[in-house]
């Protein structure tokens, strides 16, 4: 695996986790929003969907070629790919919170107010997980930098 390919993989992980943190912060920010821009109900929690990106020389692709009877190229450098965000989806499964507040302008005829389905504990857990995954990618990048630097020192 080339160093540049490794940097691309780490970069894709950093980008994906940054987007995950952005979505968590949007959820926390809108945790009390009772009406979205189009005026249709309260804000719904959003979630990020990730997908592993398999390169042309990834382990999965090599196994598929071997199963098809192709002779694997032993000298080929693996191209693992990384990770990408496929979509940001709204949480349709978690019910909205209903609170009795007849004085609120967005309350229904019975006086109930629909609040977002954002659970602050879940959001904090997601933020911590994304932050740790981001930090792991930074550590991997720093390790790669150290390896490259050591290689350059040996070459002198």
Annotated model-derived regions:
Residues 1-156:
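Amphipathic alpha-helical polymerization modules
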């Amino acid at each position: 695996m080339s160093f540049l390919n490794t940097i691309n993989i780490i970069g894709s992980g950093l980008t994906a986790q940054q987007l995950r943190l952005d979505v968590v912060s949007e959820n926390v920010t809108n945790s009390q929003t009772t009406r979205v821009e189009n005026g249709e109900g309260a804000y719904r929690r959003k979630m990020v969907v990730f997908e592993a990106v398999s390169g042309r020389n990834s382990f999965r692709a090599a196994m598929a070629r071997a199963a098809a009877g192709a002779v694997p190229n032993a000298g080929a450098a693996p191209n693992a790919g990384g990770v990408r965000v496929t979509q940001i989806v709204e949480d349709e499964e978690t019910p909205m919170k209903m609170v009795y507040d007849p004085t609120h302008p967005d309350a229904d005829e019975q006086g109930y107010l629909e609040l977002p389905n954002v659970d602050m504990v879940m959001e904090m857990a997601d933020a911590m997980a994304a932050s740790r995954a981001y930090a792991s990618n930074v550590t991997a990048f720093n390790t790669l930098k150290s390896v490259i630097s050591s290689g350059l020192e040996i070459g002198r």
